[in-house]
Every structure is written in C-alpha cells, then in structure tokens.
C-alpha cells in the first residue's frame, strides 16, 4: 500500500493493496519528532537549575495534539493501552500516567520504563521530564503525590490537601474507587491552560496550584481548590467515561 499525507489535518491515510482480513492487524511505523514551544503536543518549558535556565518537557495532547507526538488514532472514542519508556538527562524526573517498573541511571542518562496504562484515549497520555521533588500522602491504596520544583514544594501543601480530600470524597460518592495505583499532581512553569487531567498525572500551571500560606489570599486558595477538585473529578468524567467527540461536551 501507500500513505496519503495531509499537512492541514496532520493525518496519514494508508491505502491498502487488498482488503483487510477479519482478525487482528498490526501497523508498524518508525517516526521522530521535535519538542515545540507552543505549549501543545510535546512542549518545552523553561525551568531553573541552580539559577540557570534549563529545558524541561511536558505534554498537552487535548484535543487532537497526540498526533503531534506519535502516530495514533487520537479521536477520543478510540482507546488503547500504552507502554512507555523515557530516556532523559540524569538530573530530571521522568513521569507518566503509571508507576515506574524500572529506573536506571547510567552515563549521564536516566531510563525509566512505566507500567502499561489502562485502556484510555490518547489525549490523556502524559510524558513529563523536569527537575521536581515529591511529597506524598495516601488515600486508601492510592498514592497521591505533588511534584514541584524543590524550592516551591512547601507551596504545594494546600493543593495536596485539596486533592486528598477530593479523591476521598469522590471514591465514596461514585461508589467506584479511583482505578490507578497513583495520582500525581505536577507543576509546570509554562502551561497555557490552568490544568490538564491526564489520567494519573495531572498537569498544572504553577499559578493555578502553588499557595504561599503567608501571602496568598482566600480567593487564591479557593481558586486552587476549585481547579484541583475539577481535575480530580475528570479522573472519572472524561478519563474513565469518555465522550465520543468534543461536541459532546
């Protein structure tokens, strides 16, 4: 067969020489891509390391930006499992939707392989690599962790408490507990949206997440609590139960 490429739609249509036979079929594709600074797809954020600027990587794939990162069916009603390995500079923390199965640092590189995801829409796939520190609490069997730059970690306490409260409440409200073994709440210094509900690895803009207990207003705290609760609810509405297309929202 041969591929037809649309630069406008960013799609590839495969024309086959013969009809597909009933049963399983496999498409293999070699590809490469680039990080951008558009804050969609796989994008570059400007972090800090000992006072110097450093490039960090995050993904924002909603609504149809997964196709900027990897060949996939990225319409939300198509769901798949994902197996992911990240190879990043040794000083950075790789994160994704699921917990790490292996974590090896050698020759200045850190290679982390993650557990296979639940079946999910591709717009929820998370790929992060940044200089972040964790702080965790448990809700039942779920480990809830905030990831923030080390110098800002104390400012994530309020959001961590909000996430723990929301997750505990929603587990009881739905009578269908959160499915994944972990829920990460990750801070990015550059992000166009307030937050993105990637399953198991929610991404937040720092201004929508960090609270200084001495300086932040009650209105700022209320806003952070609303954003965190909104994204935790999405772990059920959107992630577990998903619309067929974006006009169903």
State what each model feature region is.
Residues 1-2, 53, 91:
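Solvent-exposed beta-hairpin/edge-strand motifs
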Residues 31, 198, 236:
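Short glycine/serine/threonine-biased micro-segments
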Residues 13-14, 66-69:
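Short acidic, glycine/Ser/Thr-rich loop/turn "cap" segments at secondary-structure junctions
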Residues 50-56, 76:
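N-terminal, polar/Ser/Thr-rich
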Residues 232-247:
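Catalytic Zn2+-binding segment of zinc metalloproteases
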Residues 1-49, 107:
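A surface-exposed beta-strand-loop module
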Residues 59-64, 71-229, 246-248:
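Hydrophobic helix-coil surface modules that form long, contiguous segments used
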């Amino acid at each position: 067969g041969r591929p037809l490429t649309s630069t406008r739609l960013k799609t590839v249509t495969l024309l086959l020489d013969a009809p597909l036979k009933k049963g399983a079929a496999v498409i293999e594709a070699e590809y490469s891509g680039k990080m951008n600074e558009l804050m969609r797809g796989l994008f570059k954020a400007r972090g800090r390391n000992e006072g110097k600027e450093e490039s960090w990587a995050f993904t924002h794939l909603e609504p149809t930006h997964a196709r900027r990162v990897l060949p996939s069916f990225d319409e939300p009603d198509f769901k798949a499992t994902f197996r992911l390995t990240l190879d990043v500079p040794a000083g950075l923390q790789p994160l994704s939707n699921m917990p790490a199965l292996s974590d090896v640092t050698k020759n200045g590189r850190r290679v982390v392989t993650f557990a296979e995801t639940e079946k999910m829409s591709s717009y929820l796939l998370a790929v992060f690599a940044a200089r972040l520190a964790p702080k965790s609490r448990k809700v039942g069997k779920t480990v809830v962790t905030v990831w923030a730059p080390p110098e800002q970690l104390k400012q994530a306490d309020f959001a961590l408490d909000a996430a723990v409260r929301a997750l505990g409440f929603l587990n009881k409200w739905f009578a269908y507990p959160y499915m994944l073994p972990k829920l990460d709440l990750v801070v990015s210094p550059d992000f166009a949206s307030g937050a993105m509900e990637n399953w198991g690895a929610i991404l937040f803009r720092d201004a929508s997440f960090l609270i200084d207990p001495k300086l932040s207003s009650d209105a700022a705290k209320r806003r952070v609590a609303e954003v965190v609760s909104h994204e935790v609810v999405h772990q059920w509405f959107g992630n577990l139960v998903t619309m067929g297309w974006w006009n169903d929202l």
